[in-house]
Amino acid sequence: MRAFAAVALLLAACTQPQVANVTVTAMRASPPVAHGRVAEVTFHSRALDVDKRYFVYLPAGYGTLPRRFPVVYLLHGLGGDERDWIDQGHLPEAADRIGLAAMVVMPDGDESFYVNSVTPADYANCVKLARHDFAGRRETAASFCVRHADYETYVARDLVDDVDARFRTVATRQARGIAGLSMGGFGALMLAMRHLDRFSAAASHSGLDALLYAGPHPYRKGHVQLATDVSRWGAEVEPIGALVRRIFGPDVASFRAHDPAALATTLSDGQLAIYLDCGTEDNFGLEDEAAYLHDVLASR
């Protein structure tokens, strides 16, 4: 599956450690690396009712070959923005290094968890405060504040439609994958599982893969506890918990409707290609959620 191969290769390349101060003696010259380029786009999202910016990596052959290209959507984590994968993930260099023959779209997800929030946006107050708990240092009110907090619709509909209209894409689900880090890993799985007409592959790197997973820590198969009361969800990691509760609301059904581990039980065999990983030094128990989701998928 083209989209899955692109997602897995790209995520591995962007998240592998950078090696410095290493001397290598070349035995023979390596072929030159073909370089892609990064384009910056601003468009109006109907779902958010504001203008949003995204970056798109165009592979080396985009300017010379008449063909169309598959697309990977790459989502940033909490506190990040649309430049994170370029500045910190070194996306262009990683994509060039593996010869990625796909476009990579990096949108601005603010602190939304890529969900249509149950709490309405307060645009006027957001602009007035001009300060946001998790917004990156580059964020201004103009780039952060929205009139409607419908981020799921913004990514799955507005963004995908704009990219397909603006660039030479293969505009089918089979040629679209979505991946992300942390909040973005959750967003990638959730969006792909809830919009199977849009995406055929999803990848989560240290993501919130099971919103309602309540233990044990470490994970033990067959002993899983799932939360039934979300009134204090994430209380041990405030203010992140308060943000998530504001987005999903007080109803456990809202959490369950967006929980990748719950959504995974509805998938048919071969319906969605999925890649999961998590760092060994994670401090939020996310590796337990990844292990649980893996077993949910394996047991279907």
Over which residues does each language-model region extend?
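Sec-dependent signal peptide recognition
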Residues: 1-7
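C-terminal motif of bacterial Sec signal peptides marking the signal peptidase cleavage site
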Residues: 11-13
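Short, surface-exposed beta-edge/turn micro-motifs
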Residues: 7-8, 101
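Non-catalytic cap/lid and distal C-terminal segments of serine-dependent acyl enzymes
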Residues: 15-300
